[in-house]
């Protein structure tokens, strides 16, 4: 059984591969600043995409997307603007996405992508 940190890292790696196979260009991972952390930053066409990755071993405590609260979404919006300013992307439209990664013991991972949160 993986630790929570190992599960999160595996989930982020699987999510990055998943998005790349769908044409996204990953430009940053685990970007941190005093306001928080962004799991994945990517481009989907013209959109600068901030992707929140939620990995779980099971649905016992609910679907991974249920862990994205209104407060988390507000923080992601703030982080998106901070990342764009820090990296000089002033004209790209910004979109917040989420990737749910379910990694049951002994089974293949299952991923879901939700575009354009709130």
UniProtKB/Swiss-Prot annotation:
Belongs to the UPF0102 family. The lineage of its organism: Bacteria, Bacillati, Actinomycetota, Actinomycetes, Micrococcales. This is UPF0102 protein RSal33209_1090. It comes from the Bacteria. It comes from Renibacterium salmoninarum (strain ATCC 33209 / DSM 20767 / JCM 11484 / NBRC 15589 / NCIMB 2235). GO terms for molecular function: nucleic acid binding. PANTHER family: UPF0102 PROTEIN YRAN (PTHR34039:SF1). InterPro entries: Restrct_endonuc-II-like, tRNA_endonuc-like_dom_sf, UPF0102_YraN-like.
